[in-house]
Every structure is written in structure tokens, then in C-alpha cells.
Amino acid sequence: MKKNLLYCCTLAVVLCLMSFMAGDDVMTKQDGMYVIDTTTLGKNVEGYQAPTPLKVYIKNDQVEKIEFLKSQETPKYYIKVKKALVDKWNGLTVKNAKTQQVDVVTGATFSSEAVIENVHLALDYYQSHK
């Protein structure tokens, strides 16, 4: 009985520790850039019908590019959002990118707002974990 209890407690501790490590895949370093993936970071940030995950690439405290990842948003509208927003933060310092005023895409407001929120999540994460 004591062995089973000890085993269960050990398993619970290991699982708790693993849950704290979940953020390790959020920010990686690639080709001298920090890459922040909002797939798990922004999993609750949804556009019209689905999450809108992104990768934000940062080098020397400056946004290099935004990469739109696969989403279940309506393709017709998500493509419009991607075309309109993909380069809005490029070349800006992280500080300036966080305050950049970006207009939403007409007809794709929810998707646009979700993308903007994911960019802000990525920038905040970068600043607190670099």
C-alpha cells in the first residue's frame, strides 16, 4: 500500500513539473533569431472559428518577420488577414511593435484581432523570457 502511495505521489510530482516545462517550446533560437511560437501560448486566442497561431521572429530586439501557421479559420478570410497584416510589424523594435496601431481587415475582424493579440502575446513573452 505504501509503495503504491509513494508511486502515485512521485508520478503526480513528475506530471506537475512537466506542466511547468510546457513553455520550453514557445521560444527557440534559430539562425541567430528568437522564434516565438504562439501555438500553445495563444491557444485560447481565437478568430472567428479557430485559433490563429503564429511564429514571430526577433533578432537584435527587432521584429524580422511574422509567419502564419496553419489555422482552421475560413481560408478566404484568413488569406486576406495574412496579406494585410503579415508585414505590419517587420523592422520595428519590440517596444515599438507592441504599440503599433494596426487596423483590422474589413470582413475579417475577429481573425484580425486574434492575429494582433497573438503578436502581442509573442512580444510580451519575448520581453519577459529573453
Question: Where do the PLM segments sit?
Answer:
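Flexible, solvent-exposed loop/hinge segments and secondary-structure transition points
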Residues: 2, 6-7, 21-130
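Bacterial N-terminal signal peptides
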Residues: 8-18
